[in-house]
């Protein structure tokens, strides 16, 4: 019987939980505001993890906030190394998740089309 989830999917899910906990309790960076980990995409060979984040109440521009978050990657890898049972912890790369903004934009477009009677 095939497994329901691949190993990379299971690692992604565990990393998402651990990274969210680390960002909530392990860093002192009030300029980032509240950081939400929306997804973690781990490569098939488990070498790289792309962590998608959003910011609420950040005092920095998005790019600067992602760069600032990247400064915590080495410390985060150490924490993950202690908490996860893996021989090698993936390299962590942070990226801003703009899916919410794109969704809101699509909603505005659909509303304007509906208002104009085009839908």
Swiss-Prot record:
GO terms for molecular function: ribosomal small subunit binding. It is found in: Cytoplasm. Keywords: Cytoplasm, Ribosome biogenesis. It holds the Pfam family RBFA. One of its GO terms (cellular component) is cytosol. The keyword Cytoplasm applies. One of its GO terms (biological process) is maturation of SSU-rRNA. It comes from the Bacteria. Its main location: cytoplasm. Belongs to the RbfA family. PANTHER family: RIBOSOME-BINDING FACTOR A, CHLOROPLASTIC-RELATED. One of several proteins that assist in the late maturation steps of the functional core of the 30S ribosomal subunit. Associates with free 30S ribosomal subunits (but not with 30S subunits that are part of 70S ribosomes or polysomes). Required for efficient processing of 16S rRNA. May interact with the 5'-terminal helix region of 16S rRNA. Monomer. Binds 30S ribosomal subunits, but not 50S ribosomal subunits or 70S ribosomes. This is Ribosome-binding factor A.
């Amino acid at each position: 019987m095939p497994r329901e989830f691949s190993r990379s999917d299971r690692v992604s899910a565990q990393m998402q939980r651990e990274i969210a906990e680390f960002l909530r309790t392990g860093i002192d960076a009030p300029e980032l505001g509240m950081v939400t980990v929306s997804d973690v995409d781990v490569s098939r060979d488990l070498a790289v993890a792309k962590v998608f984040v959003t910011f609420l109440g950040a005092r920095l521009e998005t790019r600067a906030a992602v760069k600032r978050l990247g400064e915590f990657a080495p410390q985060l890898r150490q924490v993950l190394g202690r908490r996860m049972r893996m021989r090698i912890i993936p390299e962590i790369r942070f990226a801003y998740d703009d899916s919410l903004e794109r969704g809101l934009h699509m909603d505005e477009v659909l509303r304007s089309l509906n208002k104009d009677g085009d839908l």
